[in-house]
Amino acid sequence: LTNKRKDEKTISYAECHDQALVGDKTLIFRLMDKEMYTSMNKDSKNLIVDRGMALHKMIRLATIATAGDGYLNFMGNEFGHPEWIDFPREGNGWSYKYARRQWSLSEPDYLRYKYLMDFDRDMVHLFKEEDLLAFPPEPILADEAKKVLIFKRKNCIFALNFNPSASFTDYSFKAPEGEWELIFDSDDENYDGFSRLKNGERHWSDGKMNLYLPCRCAFVLKKIH
């Protein structure tokens, strides 16, 4: 994520142009595959889709939060567009069928695409509002065994638990002293999460902080005092 030269400006992205074209799969389609065609209704109960939603949000937050100088979305990955792009050509009979992006999918409340779009909008707004890309990420912890990644950027701490099944209570790590407030959470119900954390909850650090880290969840704490 941070393997870049400090003297060269770079743009980070979770998926590239080629993944969206016919012959490959978008990030979200790799995570959910055919389940996207039947289980993107918000009321549907599908563990594969739940997993895909959680990881898609986490991957995008991890990407922008470690970016060098900018973050790039590409043609619908903001809301997890389900299909590929295929421009008219001889091989498809000069068809326009897949030469599109269905932005309307991100509008209805009953489809999960809306919650991915809302997450992306608020995530990008956070980075603009706090001017976070103007400051480099500072590693705090990378726990390979538990699949936990924690780092700091400007006045914010980013905590990501990629563990598929284990949530951690009172997870302890070194952190700058002060009072910290939860300002962004991938597990928020507004982003089709399970709201295992409380919006605005506060934590204190005396040089060490203890946090509850739900599985497949990423969140941001901002120092307020």
What are the language-model segments listed below?
Residues 1-90, 96, 128, 132-138, ...:
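Conserved alpha/beta catalytic core and glycan-binding cleft of carbohydrate-active enzymes
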Residues 174-190:
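Solvent-exposed beta-hairpin/edge-strand motifs
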Residues 42-52, 104-114, 205-210:
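Active-site rim elements
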Residues 189-197:
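Acidic Ser/Thr/Pro-rich low-complexity disordered segments
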Residues 92-105, 199-201:
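Short glycine/proline- and charge-enriched loop/turn segments
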